[in-house]
């Protein structure tokens, strides 16, 4: 007996049906905003993540040497890949470039609530617009996808911040601070205790007093206090940009889902401007549901022309927890429109009926095991068939078939020449 690997899951048809419905809902919303689907590889050169993603991602890579002697890794995230793709065809692409994709990723990390070693994300990115409206459109696409799933403002919030505010405040300190390490500490704030958090800030170069000041500034509700403390154009511009994005979010109708939270940092090194994370407002799903933000320098770092960019990666594992908590996760059940049941030597006619129903777009099953009437009916119940079409020898003598409603058990005979009709999904109720 072979057991599955820890952190890698199988999805049986009922659960997979629910996951497919969620994925389709998100992707439909992305398409309505004009995002185009792309396909990306499962393997990349390991050096791509060493150079672009940061230490935390590199430590979690599924990395190995392939048979050609190349150091490669299973993709742990999408952003570096799509950035590389943009650079490869930058001159030919109409700007802004708006892409999305849904696919699995892999990270060797501790398995816990909403976190697995193989996980699925829908990534939504805009390349080529520095306007705050681009940030707002990404927020709006994500928010609308969540409301399409049945969630509302009582279920989730977007905590919005700005990396240049964090970097500008750190630069205003007297000490020589490692900004990258300090921002990583902020990103871990909700996952560690206060003592460890402050230890990380001090380890990044802040004095204990500066760490207290920095932490206090991140908690302020008055953004003008940040501008006054730093006294720099950098922080002033970042505050203005953050406000502009929030104003644009209001224009898109999603400002109600957004709150300013400077303790939101995002751990990946390539983020540059506005960043955000989605959280369960009840706190039951304790970790970030998903996040995103600006990465304006990444395309240029690949050798491309300077190209502003912003995106979000919607993690399906934590999203499923949020939907389940809110009671909007789709039913995990099989769904079949028709089961065509044969009695006696009627298989040819039954297959003709099934073929016509499928041509109309319906989900149809027939007997593949030469079972009797009772066993076929039990199978139809097991696959949650809505309607059973009985094609029996007696029915055919009457030039008819029998429709049986599986919920009520009621049935009626229907002329074969009139079934199925050219449109609709006929059931017992249409003929009773």
UniProtKB/Swiss-Prot annotation:
Residues 422-432 have a biased composition (Basic and acidic residues). GO terms for cellular component: cytoplasm. Pfam families: HGTP_anticodon, tRNA-synt_His. SUPFAM superfamilies: Class II aaRS ABD-related, Class II aaRS and biotin synthetases. It comes from the Archaea. Keywords: Aminoacyl-tRNA synthetase, ATP-binding, Cytoplasm, Ligase, Nucleotide-binding, Protein biosynthesis. It is an enzyme of class 6 (ligase). It is found in: Cytoplasm. It catalyses: tRNA(His) + L-histidine + ATP = L-histidyl-tRNA(His) + AMP + diphosphate + H(+). NCBIfam families: hisS. PANTHER family: HISTIDINE--TRNA LIGASE, MITOCHONDRIAL-RELATED (PTHR43707:SF1), HISTIDYL-TRNA SYNTHETASE (PTHR43707). Belongs to the class-II aminoacyl-tRNA synthetase family. This is Histidine--tRNA ligase.
């Amino acid at each position: 007996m072979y057991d599955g690997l820890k952190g890698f899951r199988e999805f049986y048809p009922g659960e997979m049906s629910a996951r497919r419905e969620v994925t389709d809902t998100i992707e439909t919303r992305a398409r309505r905003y004009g995002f185009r689907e792309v396909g990306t590889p499962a393997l990349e050169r390991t050096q791509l993540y060493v150079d672009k993603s940061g230490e935390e991602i590199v430590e979690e890579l599924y990395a190995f040497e392939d048979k050609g002697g190349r150091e490669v890794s299973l993709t742990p995230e999408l952003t570096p890949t799509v950035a590389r793709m943009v650079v490869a065809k930058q001159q030919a692409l109409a700007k802004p470039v708006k892409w999305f994709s849904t696919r699995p990723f892999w990270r060797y990390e501790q398995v816990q609530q909403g976190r697995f070693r193989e996980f699925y994300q829908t990534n939504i990115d805009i390349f080529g617009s520095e306007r705050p409206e681009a940030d707002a459109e990404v927020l709006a696409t994500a928010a609308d996808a969540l409301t399409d799933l049945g969630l509302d403002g009582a279920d989730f919030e977007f905590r919005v911040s700005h990396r240049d505010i964090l970097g500008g405040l750190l630069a205003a300190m007297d000490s020589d601070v490692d900004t990258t390490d300090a921002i990583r500490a902020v990103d871990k704030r909700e996952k560690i205790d206060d003592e460890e958090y402050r230890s990380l800030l001090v380890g990044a170069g802040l004095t204990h007093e500066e760490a207290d000041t920095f932490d206090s500034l991140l908690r302020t509700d008055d953004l003008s206090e940040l501008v006054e403390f730093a006294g720099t154009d950098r922080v002033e511009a970042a505050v203005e940009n953050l406000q502009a994005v929030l104003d644009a979010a209001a224009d898109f109708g999603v400002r109600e889902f957004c709150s300013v939270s400077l303790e939101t940092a995002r751990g990946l090194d390539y983020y540059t401007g506005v960043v955000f994370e989605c959280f369960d407002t009840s706190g039951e799903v304790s970790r970030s549901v998903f996040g995103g933000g600006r990465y304006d320098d990444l395309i240029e770092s690949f050798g491309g022309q300077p190209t502003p960019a912003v995106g979000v990666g919607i993690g399906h594992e934590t999203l499923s927890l949020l939907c389940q908590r809110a009671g909007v996760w789709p039913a995990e059940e099989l769904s079949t429109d028709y089961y065509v049941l044969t009695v006696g030597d009627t298989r040819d006619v039954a297959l003709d009926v099934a073929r016509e129903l499928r041509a109309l777009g319906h989900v149809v099953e027939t007997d593949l095991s030469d079972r009797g009437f009772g066993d076929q009916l039990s199978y139809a119940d097991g696959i949650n068939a809505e309607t059973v079409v009985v094609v029996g020898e007696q029915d055919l003598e009457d030039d008819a078939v029998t429709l049986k409603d599986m919920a009520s058990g009621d049935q009626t005979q229907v002329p074969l020449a009139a079934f199925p009709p050219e449109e609709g999904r006929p059931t017992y109720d249409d003929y009773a």
